[in-house]
């Protein structure tokens, strides 16, 4: 046993005769994280990763060396975790240090999470680790939508799928649909429902009996929904997008959607092109997984949403009369 500067360490030697031995004892004086790990932000339940972390031990004689063989605690991130303790032992001496981490608490109940938290989970591509298709969160729609004022409508948005059709529409996305009222799938209707009208701002696909210009140039996309807005935080005025809550709009991501953007009734494959949308309607194929009326080439670029593939009802009801079925644009 030897002591140096208050540090004690031991080593075992074998004495075979009357001989003098010089024993070098390696004594750890301190340990430090000299390069932070690559990943420092976690969600609750994730496992700490030391990848990229460099741990340096200072010996009692003042020398330094990069070490491995350290241990880390805790390994599973909890809501109250702010740092991970790193421990290293050598020569019978254990020294510790800490490295800071940030842990975001995730509730498995979708509605208990803020939209900012949901966005963070979406960005990490981990939505399905915490929530399920069909899970819902309540919002309030408030504002003028086209020519109709909707005042403080409580409605739930629900998950249609995780990373839906990601290779075409964009990765790390959670797709939601608006919406349900007390569990009933609804469509928003206005005072012109079931009547022909040329009124600008009515909930119609176009203001005349035409599909010229397809989805891209439709009255529904631009004037009613505001789906073509350049930013969800700067939406086109008097659109559904503008009437959504600000905290939801702050985290919305656009998706690349494929549809017939020429129109005219000719079933021409080249008419199917992409648009960037913040608030698109679902297509026939996304609802049904089959095509009857849409351009037959659309389905080559689309996928049925998991929510509807699971057999959930596609019947919509009027948002202001939830016992009355309604036709839905698609």
Predicted regions and their residues:
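Solvent-exposed, low-complexity, repeat-rich "mucin-like" stalks and linkers
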Residues: 27-64
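Protein-protein interaction and targeting regions used for scaffolding, dimerization, and localization
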Residues: 7, 31, 37-42, 48, ...
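Edge beta-strands of extracellular beta-sandwich domains
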Residues: 8-15, 95-102
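Collagenous Gly-X-Y triple-helix signature in extracellular proteins
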Residues: 106-330
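Extracellular interdomain linker/stem segments of modular secreted and single-pass surface proteins
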Residues: 16-22, 26-28, 103-107
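Solvent-exposed, conformationally flexible loop/turn segments
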Residues: 16-19, 43-45, 79-80
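Extracellular/surface recognition and adhesion modules
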Residues: 1-2, 13, 33, 55, ...
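Serine/threonine-rich, repeat-prone extracellular segments and beta-strand-based repeat modules
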Residues: 1, 62-95
